[in-house]
């Protein structure tokens, strides 16, 4: 097993600005899971394919509440009973510029549109293959989740406040935990 190394925040921000993916792990007392995280505005088809092939979890796109409201993205359910209150909205796809909706290129295109503050609701159809998540106001200060971390990191990188996350799942189906990520 290789030794796990935690990177300083300035390196993480530089990687996100360069369009790279980083790993964010939450507290062992919460979900104790690790996610691949990228900046939505810079996400590439290659990064989406990497997330699908090696992350293996759901690929989701955290956004700020103002963005969800501007795009008329209603909650997936009117009463969220999930333990961590993950705020899924209705799923979306780009209305134009895609062919299969699910390919890495099509998902990256939809996610980039979602992150672009100049794109309005008419650019999307519902339901779709992209799962936006509405981050909590004040980010990780109020809810220490991957959703808020992705939005906060994008902001710190000077990018639109939108991320892309994918839980890391091992080939056997167990979740990636901090202690076993080096395996």
Where are these regions (language model features)?
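Catalytic domains of riboflavin
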Residues: 1-183
